[in-house]
Swiss-Prot record:
Cited InterPro entries: Enolase, Enolase-like_C_sf, Enolase-like_N, Enolase_C, Enolase_CS, Enolase_N
Active site, UniProt feature: E205 (proton donor), K337 (proton acceptor)
Catalyzed reactions per annotation: (2R)-2-phosphoglycerate = phosphoenolpyruvate + H2O
Chain positions recorded as Mg(2+) binding sites: D242, E285, D312
Entry EC no(s): 4.2.1.11
PROSITE patterns per the UniProt record, alphabetical: ENOLASE (PS00164)
Organism domain of life: Bacteria
Cofactor(s) it depends on: Mg(2+)
Organism of derivation: Ralstonia nicotianae (strain ATCC BAA-1114 / GMI1000)
Protein name: Enolase
Pathways per UniProt: Carbohydrate degradation; glycolysis; pyruvate from D-glyceraldehyde 3-phosphate: step 4/5
Presence of the UniProt keyword Secreted in the record: yes
Family, per entry: Belongs to the enolase family.
């Protein structure tokens, strides 16, 4: 039995200089698991609650000492002595202990830190890499990365309303080659932006945030960077967008302030369809407000056969909401963010539900990250096929890519890279 003998929660900093929760779990054998949780900038209203202290005199109210205290007292007492290899039972214990629908009492940042640290300790005890512990012998598919190379919206201080412009290398034979492709495009884009006299400073997720005049100018510049790096847009590399439309939806309209547009749901669906016709866009995330299910239905009917429509704020990694979306034919993919739900067991349940329904699952970081690379292991352990973990700069993003390189090396000849087949539900 891999009995838990000690649990230590602590306050650490994330990549934006804000406090977050880290947890160590020590087992009877002496092995330890350590995990740190991320936090988001643009968040869905139905996400599990990230518990913050609210003391304005300390870290501007963003301290997490209450969540840490919950780990070191109540949670510690509840799971001390439990078998770390019984992940589902342990996570259920955390859920029941919290007793709320949204982890609002203990904090999802507390429950997730413990859930992840326990899994890491159990994997170490079993002598298995974390991805293998999660997925068993069937874990062998590397993910196609969504690489956020231009930031707008809530992630940047510029005139772009769309939050993320991403490249997805799909024409390569391995993750290693896909990563090289993305890095070369990143450097080509930096040179193009610099030559235009624009800023090459990077945003929260490592992408550039230049002041392009329009979304189309941004997309055309990215196409130029792909070609400058020696790759073919539409063949070797596809594009992806994260609209984060909930951020610019007001009074029943989509306000693209950077372009002087106020659009109805139907008009915004047409706007996105026009972009998908003009550019090799294979994926659009949060293309409608999280509560605009009628708009989502229009968008899905218009683009759902040829573009991956990812629900992030829409589904918030929650099986109850995802189930409703599947039944109503809303979107065709879910973004998986572990801190939106607060335990690994619930995260895996959302991935499994999506796959059973023919939806894709994209494993994702948050804008406030740490050096923790667990999501890389989740992506391979669940054979998700896609990962979204930022640009080709900032060590908090690169930590995940480097972990994926190690995993691919560990898998050796059995590692597979899906390329375009990652979008298995598109025609």
């Amino acid at each position: 039995m891999s009995a838990i003998v000690d649990i230590i929660g602590r306050e650490v900093l994330d990549s934006r200089g804000n406090p977050t929760v880290e947890c160590d779990v020590l087992l009877e054998s002496g092995v330890m698991g350590r995990a740190a949780v991320p936090s988001g900038a643009s968040t869905g209203s139905r996400e599990a609650i990230e518990l913050r202290d609210g003391d304005k005199g300390r870290y501007l109210g963003k301290g997490v000492l209450k969540a840490v205290e919950h780990i070191n007292t109540e949670i510690s007492e509840a799971i001390m002595g439990l078998d770390a290899s019984e992940q589902a039972f342990l996570d259920r214990t955390l859920i029941d202990l919290d007793g709320t629908e949204n982890k609002g009492r203990l904090g999802a940042n507390a429950t997730l830190a413990v859930s992840m640290a326990v899994a890491k300790a159990a994997a170490e005890e079993a002598g298995l890499p974390l991805y293998r512990y999660f997925g068993g012998s069937g874990a062998m598919q590397m993910p196609v990365p969504m690489m956020n190379i231009v930031n707008g919206g809530a992630h940047a201080n510029n005139s772009l309303d769309i939050q993320e412009f991403m490249v997805m290398p799909v024409g390569q034979q391995s993750f290693r080659e896909a990563l090289r492709c993305g890095a070369e495009i990143f450097h080509a884009l930096k040179k193009i932006i610099a030559d235009k006299g624009m800023s090459t400073a990077v945003g929260d997720e490592g992408g550039f945030a230049p002041n392009f005049a329009s979304n189309e100018e941004c997309l055309n510049t990215i196409l130029s960077a792909i070609e400058k790096a020696g790759y073919r847009p539409g063949e070797d590399v596809l594009l992806a967008l994260d609209c984060a439309a909930s951020e610019f939806y007001r009074d029943g309209k989509y306000h693209l302030d950077g372009e002087g547009l106020q659009l109805s749901s139907v008009d915004f669906a047409n706007y996105l369809a026009n972009l998908a016709d003009k550019f090799p866009i294979v994926s659009i995330e949060d293309g409608m407000h999280e509560s605009d299910w009628d708009g989502w239905k229009v968008l899905t009917e218009k683009l759902g056969n040829k573009v991956q429509l990812v629900g992030d704020d829409l589904f918030v990694t929650n099986t109850r909401i995802l189930k409703e979306g599947i039944e109503k034919g809303i979107a065709n993919s879910i973004l998986i963010k572990i801190n939106q739900i607060g335990t690994l067991t619930e995260t895996f349940a959302a991935i499994e539900m999506a796959k059973r329904a023919g939806y894709t699952a994209v494993i994702s970081h948050r804008s406030g990250e740490t050096e923790d690379s667990t999501i890389a292991d989740i992506a391979v352990g669940t054979n998700a096929g896609q990962i979204k973990t930022g640009s080709l700069s900032r060590s908090d993003r690169i930590a995940k890519y480097n972990q994926l390189l190690r995993i691919e090396e560990d898998l050796g000849d059995i590692a597979s890279y899906p390329g375009k087949s990652a979008f298995y539900n598109l025609r």
